[in-house]
Amino acid sequence: MKRHIALIPAAGSGRRFGGKQAKQYQLIDGKPILFHTLERLNKSFFQSIYVVGKKDSFDFASFKKDYESFFPGVIFLPLGGEERSDTVQKAVFYLFQQNKVFSQDWLWVHDAVRCLIQEKWLQTLKQVVEEKNHSAILASKVTDTVKKAEPDKLVIATTIQRDDLYLAQTPQVFPAGVLAQALEGDRTGARDEAMLVEKLGQPVELVSVSYTHLTLPTSDLV
């Protein structure tokens, strides 16, 4: 049976969010954003959930100490790297080495700060990957007018047709073996895991969701 395993990279600094503390550890309603994200995923269908933070992170250690008891099935891995792709690579390779994941399993990579994920979207994404038998990601259709600037100045070069444009979101779901293969290659310039899988020539399905799933980019939104 193909299992569904969630991987949450939580080693980022969240510089765009502002403040000294990484945004996944900042509070909403008295709890860290990561807590709310885990609360959503932990109620869903996942056989295993892994949170990956930095070994020397005080915030990661404090979160584990304070909230681990709320999520007894969640496993915290101190394997975080400097970049997101480093964190995901180290975690995926570790899970394979420890026989915690196998090539046929589905690996879900979900941003720690995307705490607005809805169960209906998880279920839809699960249905799509199981029916199509290949990778898929959540994505929001671009609805704003998009302008491209000149390379060296803030002057409009052209207006981009938005009909086929989507904003990549998470979760991003992959056959574990495909993701591991993608992470073995050149990760330079890769914005997300889907981009790495694209480089392999593998199909990645888009599952359209609303803008309400977008991350929290600035501190004045909470």
Where on the chain are the PLM-derived regions?
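N-terminal glycine-rich phosphate-binding loop and ensuing alpha1 helix
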Residues: 2-58
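Short beta-strand segments
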Residues: 7-11, 52, 110, 138-141, ...
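Residue-level signal for inorganic ion chemistry
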Residues: 8, 34, 91, 111, ...
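Conserved N-terminal catalytic core of the sugar/cofactor nucleotidyltransferase
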Residues: 34-104
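Short aromatic/hydrophobic "clamp" motif used to bind/position activated sugar donors
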Residues: 107
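Conserved core of the sugar-phosphate nucleotidyltransferase
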Residues: 116-207
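Conserved small/polar residues in nucleotide/adenosyl-binding loops
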Residues: 212-218
